[in-house]
């Protein structure tokens, strides 16, 4: 695995962690809160984003405008059944969700969830490091690398890991500050 391949894989892992962070409520309306909702539409699980336009007309409201009005009730049901705790308001044309302010207890729960996502991201990064170092050691055994080259390559992999873990930590700190801001 080349250095650029490793960095690319680690970048994707950090981006996946960032997407997970985006699904956590911060007290303000954000359409990405609904990213994980899928709707049973014509017998298939379909992502909400594929069925409707999501917008945030103000800081406390998410508006969902379905492309097909017949999907309105299905979308409403999927949101109500989700773990987000939102109550959708259906007016026959659009669905509006009022995002209530977070309680202190919910803020702490969401901070814990953000920490969990960050830890999962770090584990994924460490797994990539382990795979890269295993390949380097294998190449050293096969004689492709000298001992010094192997050590240098392993140090480079570790420095790359440290850089990306620091990035995950920075994203976590930003998200926690966002969650705790009243």
UniProtKB/Swiss-Prot annotation:
Q: Give a yes or no for keyword Protein biosynthesis in this entry.
A: yes
Q: Which Pfam families does UniProt cross-reference here?
A: RRF
Which InterPro entries does the UniProt record give? Ribosome_recyc_fac, Ribosome_recyc_fac_dom, RRF_sf
NCBIfam families in the record, alphabetically? frr
Recall the GO molecular function terms of this protein's record. Answer: ribosomal large subunit binding
Q: What does this protein do?
A: Responsible for the release of ribosomes from messenger RNA at the termination of protein biosynthesis. May increase the efficiency of translation by recycling ribosomes from one round of translation to another.
Answer yes or no on keyword Magnesium.
no
Q: Quick one: a GO biological-process term for this protein?
A: translational termination
Q: Name its cellular compartments.
A: Cytoplasm
**Cellular component GO terms held in the UniProt record:** cytoplasm
Query: What span is annotated as the signal peptide, if there is one?
Result: none
Listed name of the protein = Ribosome-recycling factor
Question: What's this protein's family per the entry?
Answer: Belongs to the RRF family.
Which UniProt keyword terms apply here?
Cytoplasm, Protein biosynthesis
Superkingdom per UniProt = Bacteria
């Amino acid at each position: 695995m080349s250095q650029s391949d490793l960095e690319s894989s680690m970048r994707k892992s950090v981006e996946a962690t960032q997407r997970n962070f985006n699904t956590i409520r911060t007290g303000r309306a954000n359409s990405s809160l609904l990213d994980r909702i899928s709707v049973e539409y014509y017998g298939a699980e379909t992502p909400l984003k594929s069925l409707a336009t999501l917008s945030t007309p103000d800081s406390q409201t998410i508006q969902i405008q379905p492309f097909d009005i017949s999907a309105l009730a299905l979308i409403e049901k999927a949101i109500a059944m989700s773990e987000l705790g939102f109550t959708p308001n259906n007016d026959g044309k659009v669905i509006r969700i009022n995002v209530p302010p977070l309680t202190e207890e919910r803020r702490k729960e969401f901070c814990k969830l953000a920490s969990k996502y960050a830890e999962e991201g770090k584990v994924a990064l460490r797994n990539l490091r382990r795979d890269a170092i295993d390949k380097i050691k294998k190449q050293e055994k096969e004689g492709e690398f000298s001992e010094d080259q192997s050590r240098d390559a392993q140090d480079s992999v570790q420095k790359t890991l440290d850089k990306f873990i620091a990035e995950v930590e920075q994203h976590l700190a930003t998200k926690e500050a966002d969650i705790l801001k009243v």
